[in-house]
Amino acid sequence: MQETSATITAERKHSHVDVCLNRPVCFDGQDTGLDAWRFEHNAAPEIDFAEIDLTAEFLGHAIGMPLMISSMTGGYGDALALNRTLAEAAERFRIPLGVGSMRQALEGNSHRESFSIVRSSAPSVPIFANIGAPEVAAGLSREQLSTLVELIEADGLIVHLNPAQELFQPEGSTNFRGFLDRLHDITATINVPVIAKEVGCGISAPLASKLADAGVKAIDVAGAGGISWQKVEECRYLDRFGNEERFSPSALDEFLNWGIPTAECLTGIAALKEKSPEYGSLAVISSGGIRNGLDVAKSIALGADIAASAQHLLKALRAGTLEETIRTWANDLRAAMFLTGSATTAQLKHAPIYRKP
């Protein structure tokens, strides 16, 4: 029974990557909102472009630039090579890496190496384990979660919140009752920091405060504007069941594009942290449609500590341009810092940025 469950999960993980790489699954009803913001130009930056420092700190770890390779994959055969390449890039650029959902590793042993490969390939950078909110709500034990952390020698645990994805997923788990209480139990007992992450619909400031109260140390907003996991699962549903309708046609488009834009998540949480000092230490990751280093720079100025990307970097990996893409993004970021007079990423946090009229 366990191996059957593990096989089903592995097949789903493979399907997810295939759909994300080959089907039109990005939001088309709204964007990240980052394009609505512009930096104030500094015509006398008083810094040397060659000396701009991209290094940053995240959850106590020094990193090479404020970018994370976001949670994408693992738990099936082909994922081993993908995760090895992603981890090697993370190590080369000294940036964090999150693995995809590790549910399959709890269901069977067949593809555990697709996860464990990341630590052997990236021995010195922060790596984060990953499990879903439905599994947490269902009562995963501290021991089970510790097993996932130990498997990849993780520096933290990502708990992904994905109600819209689960709603659309043919095999979805839609019982989230008791999640916040279970989350609090986990953060109080597990020996690594916990990150709460959406998968593309965003996290509001009120929810961020509840998650922080439950003990999470960081929020990955994963806002609307990048991949719509509703669209990913709708593709899989239609492939399996044809055009059998689940939702009213007049409502479906809004559901497929449901979510809070990334920039709106960032500004909301920044306002929360400014208003309520008890949330001041909450780290923030900007993800959901991050396309380049300028998006990273805007994210930092809008309140994020780092940004993260999944699909863009996975597509670059497939094209053989992963490291070139990361270098280009670093140069984008450096250019934005130069033109705002920000010699460090800490200074970039205070760079003037305005909503376009």
UniProtKB/Swiss-Prot annotation:
Top-level lineage group: Bacteria
Gene Ontology CC terms: cytoplasm
Catalytic activity: isopentenyl diphosphate = dimethylallyl diphosphate
Entry's EC annotation: 5.3.3.2
Keywords, sorted A to Z: Cytoplasm, Flavoprotein, FMN, Isomerase, Isoprene biosynthesis, Magnesium, Metal-binding, NADP
Compartments where found: Cytoplasm
MF annotations from Gene Ontology: FMN binding; isopentenyl-diphosphate delta-isomerase activity; magnesium ion binding; NADPH binding; oxidoreductase activity
Required cofactor(s): FMN; NADPH; Mg(2+)
Coiled coil regions, renumbered to chain: none
Alphabetical list of CDD domains matching this protein: IDI-2_FMN
Enzyme class, spelled out: isomerase
SUPFAM superfamilies: FMN-linked oxidoreductases
Role according to the record: Involved in the biosynthesis of isoprenoids. Catalyzes the 1,3-allylic rearrangement of the homoallylic substrate isopentenyl (IPP) to its allylic isomer, dimethylallyl diphosphate (DMAPP).
Family membership noted in the UniProt record: Belongs to the IPP isomerase type 2 family.
Subunit structure: Homooctamer. Dimer of tetramers.
Name of the protein this chain belongs to: Isopentenyl-diphosphate delta-isomerase
Species this chain originates from: Chlorobaculum parvum (strain DSM 263 / NCIMB 8327)
